[in-house]
């Protein structure tokens, strides 16, 4: 009888120890996933900066956007180029939003976006044309983020 209780206590301690180990492993894995997510977001930003740095035309278009131009102020091909570039930006913010909703990023991730370009006249025009390509929850979130 004493041996049985001793074996049960050993078994219980083994189960508790295993659960603690699993909990620690899950925590470590979550930390690794968050780190990888933050790295992916940083890579997206770096790619956008690289395009602007290496492509004089794109750098010029971004500069013009900050001069409050609208779609009618540039050629159709320039507009399409800026549209594609800004869609990268919108998708980057959408990715941050989805990772935030999934608990992989904190709300402070949005403070590092650099919302200035998204408040310009031409980028608002692009957004108005393309907002239907995004989930309604994200549209509402993005517009509140952009406008505040």
Give a label for each model feature.
Residues 1-71:
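Membrane-proximal alpha-helical anchors
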């Amino acid at each position: 009888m004493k041996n049985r209780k001793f074996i049960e206590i050993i078994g219980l301690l083994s189960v508790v120890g295993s659960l603690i180990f699993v909990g620690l492993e899950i925590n470590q894995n979550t930390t690794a996933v968050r780190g990888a997510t933050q790295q992916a977001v940083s890579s997206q930003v770096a790619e956008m900066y690289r395009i602007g740095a290496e492509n004089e035309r794109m750098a010029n278009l971004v500069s013009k956007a900050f001069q409050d131009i609208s779609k009618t102020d540039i050629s159709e091909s320039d507009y399409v180029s800026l549209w594609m570039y800004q869609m990268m930006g919108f998708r980057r913010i959408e990715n941050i939003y989805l990772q935030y909703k999934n608990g992989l990023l904190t709300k402070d991730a949005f403070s590092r976006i650099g919302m200035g370009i998204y408040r310009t006249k031409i980028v608002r025009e692009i957004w108005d044309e393309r907002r239907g390509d995004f989930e309604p929850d994200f549209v509402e979130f993005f517009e509140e983020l952009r406008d505040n």
